[in-house]
Amino acid sequence: MIDSIHVSQAGVEGPSPWWLKGGAIFIGVLGLLSLLNAVSLALGGIAMDAMMGEMDPEEICAEDEDTEECEDFIESIAQFSSMPLWDIGAAFSALLFLLSIPTTILLWNAEDRDMALKFAWGWVFVHAFSQFYITHEFLEWYGTFFDSIPIEDFQWLTQFTSFLSYGGVLMCELTLAAGLVLISYKTRPPTKLEAPSAFHVNNE
């Protein structure tokens, strides 16, 4: 039976700072990608509004055999261009970029581990929420878009796309969380306490 814990007299080797620095590099790269995504979403929303402003549903559908279906299709495109996804998605991406700056600095300096990890977890939370929001908003429109297409054989595609989209986002966010858990574990404060091996217990 183990009845004691020894305190090592040898020097305690601290965790490698490159675990935190590696996290800093990763979040820094994702932060730059978030900035590009914010710009693309903002420009995409402006381009969609400009395109829809030049479209006349009555003129486009005038020669179509089924005018009502054509107008429904144009209306679904108009709904896509007016979705808050463009503005809110761009705002989320910009927030991720701004949040990545202090997170990257704290992780790279590796001076305040607890604060750096709190910022990192906050960044992961915002990233997960934004990705699920964007995916949800897009799939909501996607379902409406397919409802406007009278092709019953392809109606299953909306459920299949939803499964893949939500599943992909979930796997991505779980991977980010798992990586941060690993960094937290590898950078935990060292200790001099040593538990004696069970294989060397003296039963006398």
Label every PLM stretch briefly.
Residues 2-204:
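Topology signature of small-to-medium multi-pass alpha-helical membrane proteins
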